[in-house]
Amino acid sequence: MTNNLSGYRNKFVRVKTSKKRTVSSSNWLRRQLNDPYVAKARLEGFRSRAAYKLLEIHGKFKLFNPNMKIVDLGAAPGGWSQVASKLIKASDNSLNNKIISIDLLEIEPIAEVEFFQKDFFEENTEELIIQALDGKADIVMSDMASNTIGHKATDHIRTLLLCEQAFEFALKVLKPSGHFIAKIFRGGAENELLNKVKREFRTVKHFKPSSSRSESTEIYLVALNKK
């Protein structure tokens, strides 16, 4: 599982215009068809190109180890849960391995991953996750993002609010020295949240994986070792 893209870069594929397709959907389709990470994910059996973002984060910060309990927020279509399952060797049926995934959208089952199709913001969802964990989590990770509308400031704020909710939840369920990973979009309003995170974790870093599209303002907040 490397990020070597040799053999995955195809010739540029043009997308024909269609009366039924909006400009934004045509642009998205064009990016997908010409994205080497999309092709690589398909060939290597990952649900999405986002899998490589988490692999890069782990390669940089060495977060995952066997016998961990992990919560994956905004899990669909399941790429991050797939990666986590491989990295903690969930297939060895260790009683200490546990991955709890949640999303509004349904995902195909993943071995050794317990999935709940729920709204994270519903009143009883946090308690459901806590009960399923049966103990404290080692990692809470969130790739949640709001549906983008193309207005950078609005997209930034909406995704930042999701990150804040994930952070507050992480404080409740993480064990001491646990880690928190979350997507944010750069836009200037994130500093207040970053200051909160720094008060609760010993090390806080920003990281933009090479598998993140260069034109995107997304970065990942990596908070290590909860106090």
Swiss-Prot record:
Record localization: Cytoplasm
InterPro entries assigned: RNA_methyltr_RlmE, RNA_MeTrfase_FtsJ_dom, rRNA-MeTfrase_E, SAM-dependent_MTases_sf
Residues at which S-adenosyl-L-methionine binds: G78, W80, D103, D119, D143
Gene Ontology CC: cytoplasm
Active site: K183
Keyword annotations: Cytoplasm, Methyltransferase, rRNA processing, S-adenosyl-L-methionine, Transferase
Annotated catalysed reactions: uridine(2552) in 23S rRNA + S-adenosyl-L-methionine = 2'-O-methyluridine(2552) in 23S rRNA + S-adenosyl-L-homocysteine + H(+)
Disulfide bonds: none
The family this protein is said to belong to: Belongs to the class I-like SAM-binding methyltransferase superfamily. RNA methyltransferase RlmE family.
Name the UniProt record assigns to this protein: Ribosomal RNA large subunit methyltransferase E
Organism: Rickettsia felis (strain ATCC VR-1525 / URRWXCal2) (Rickettsia azadi)
Lineage, highest ranks first: Bacteria, Pseudomonadati, Pseudomonadota, Alphaproteobacteria, Rickettsiales
